[in-house]
Amino acid sequence: EQWHQLDWFGRWLISVRASVLIMTFSSSILAGLLAWYFSTLDWGLWCLVTLGLCLAHATNNLINDATDYWRGVDDDRYMRNQYGVQPLTRGLMSGVDMLLQIGLTGMAALGIGLLLLWLRGELVLPLLAAGCFFVLFYTWPLKKWGLGEPAVLLVWGPLMVGGGFYVVSGQWSWLV
């Protein structure tokens, strides 16, 4: 009942598990603070990076929930289903709605990534490609093969902080 009283944006925020996007926001803040420290911060690019990374993380959360649901991992007994809303598992949204959210959220993230590639240059391409790889393949097969935690370490560390630093500052730094 409460679900249907929410507008589309409220339902989307719940579906993407917006409460955990703080992890991504924190990595982006770190990249921005490092660029600010080195007096190379471009605020406009930082805002784009932050929005793009949060949308990519949101896309991954949607893919994660959809994949786990369709593979039978998520059901009423699944731990996360007991403390948080799983719209697909609880029948609050259809598979088509989930695919639509994945597509639209993913296209928005990719659009920002392509804009940053155009604005900052070709070094953004491998960062964008790595980000796409982890968004698409974190849930399966990486997590299934026991590589989920190392992937998280790579994504929220060097990729988001180091890559974010490059995009907002225009400089590559191995120290960062």
Pin down the residues of each PLM region.
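Topogenic membrane-insertion module of multi-pass membrane proteins
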Residues: 1-44, 48, 145
